[in-house]
Amino acid sequence: ISHVGGTKIPTTLLRGGRVHMHHGFNPEAVLDTIAAERITTTLLVPTMVNILLDHPKLDQTDLSSLELLIYGAAPMSPTRLLEGLERIGPVFCQLYGQTEGYPLTVLRKGDHNKDDPGLFAACGHPVSSVRIALLDEEGQEVPGGEVGEICAQGPQIMDAYWQRPEQTEEVFAHGWLHTGDMAWADDRGYLYIVDRKKDMIITGGFNVFPREVEDVITTDRDIAMA
């Protein structure tokens, strides 16, 4: 497979493990497979996690074999993440990156503390092999606590887009890979994505990011996704 899920297959096979691949996402089939095959690791996007949380069979399914549930590719509501920890277990780990560079940050299992959910809105801490900077439009690092674009340098960064020199030059402005994700960093170095750069709304002189609104909406337990 061509996306980041493929990076998990060789290491599993090299350790003598088995890989179960479904043709599509069927929540009941996923739950049944985890229980029957004693699956230890799976990779899901937040929408899939939300669907599993809403499935009537979840609480009757034996998920005790599951040691690691990796999620990524989109933000996850902190409210739903807390629900996942309570109902699925302390197995969540977030990896952030993109096809042009992966992984860039990790929010480890130990960071998913349901008694201290302050990091649930974070996309993690930079992995050891990458250098991350939050840059403004001029390619300068923003002051601590302010929002800037996540930019990266490291061995896992692509060289170029195939036969697309103009796009390559644009995405590597100022010598950094520009992810298009806007974020701020806390004093420990954890990054908090506020939204995609192109999704920012300027209204009344303020920058409004849809994700901030969505996270507030999903604090209502009657709302599954926003």
PLM regions with names:
Residues 75, 107, 114-163, 171-174, ...:
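Adenylate-forming AMP-binding core of the ANL superfamily, especially NRPS adenylation
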Residues 23, 37, 56, 221-224:
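Structural motif
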Residues 9, 14-17, 31, 39-44, ...:
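Gly/Ser/Thr-rich phosphate-binding loop
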Residues 1-2:
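Conserved AMP-binding
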Residues 20, 142-143, 186, 192:
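Generic structural signal for well-ordered beta-strand positions
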Residues 34, 42-45, 154, 159-160, ...:
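AMP-binding/adenylate-forming catalytic core of the ANL superfamily
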Residues 17-37, 46-48, 208-213:
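ATP-dependent adenylate-forming carboxylate-activation enzymes
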Residues 26, 48-49, 76, 157:
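Alpha-helix capping/helix-boundary segments
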